Amino acid sequence: YTDFHYTFADKHYFQALLGFNQETRKTNSFSMYRDDLISSSFPTPELAVGEKGIGEDISEWAVRGMFFRVNYIYDDKYILEMNGRYDGTSRFPKKDRFGFFPSGSVAWVLSKEKFMENINQSIGLDMLKFRASYGALGNQNVGTYAYLPTMSSGQIGQILDGSQPVAVYAPGVVSNTLTWEKVRTINGGIDLALLNNRLSASFDYYVRYTEGMLTKSKTLPSVFGASEPKTNAADLKTKGWELSLRWRDQFMLADSPFNYSIKVALADSRAFITKYYNPNKR
């Protein structure tokens, strides 16, 4: 990534960041088991007489994206920030792999305004800041090959001609329209500090929308012979608030400064499913 920042006229601060990231992960795992050890002191398959099995798993996935951030601060009073990501993942079909996730925030430090000077002194106000933000994120919480019909293999449970042959199993049902689960959050908050920053408080209220949740879709009939795949099948709305209060101070104890801090936090939230296949809903 590259970063640029510049201060001009003593009161204007500007920063910009632009970057690129790519992550690739390859996994190759091997496992073996055999039941009925002759002695637990020697845990080796050679000293077991029961059923045995061998497993192997190979997978590969990648994520590629670009990101940016722009900050502008005027006189430490007015703060603006914008962010964005454009990400793609191999976990989704080619036509649905990429998504853009923007975010932004604004803040106003009211306590730094000139008309607040007398008020700050009279009540011991050190900082009062109002802020608001909007943010979007993407979730790719599905299997590496969830959109592809893959066949698995393994030894069957029956013995034929003195051994357990290997079988190849038919693929299950897949969704060919998988894409990013999008989470959008709108937040508003207040930060407060008093008494030489010994007492501080913070309050946030937020509404979060989760769209295209990656979950199982409508239940398929049992005669279909396969379980339902994960799709972008549901939407969720969450509303909540968070409040924190903190007191920190110090005093002399045995000729040494003793620092302490007390913090109280309260929070509440409620979530509602706003979209999901439910034929029994009235």
Give the residues covered by each predicted segment.
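Extracellular/periplasmic, surface-exposed regions of secreted and cell-surface proteins
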Residues: Y1-R282
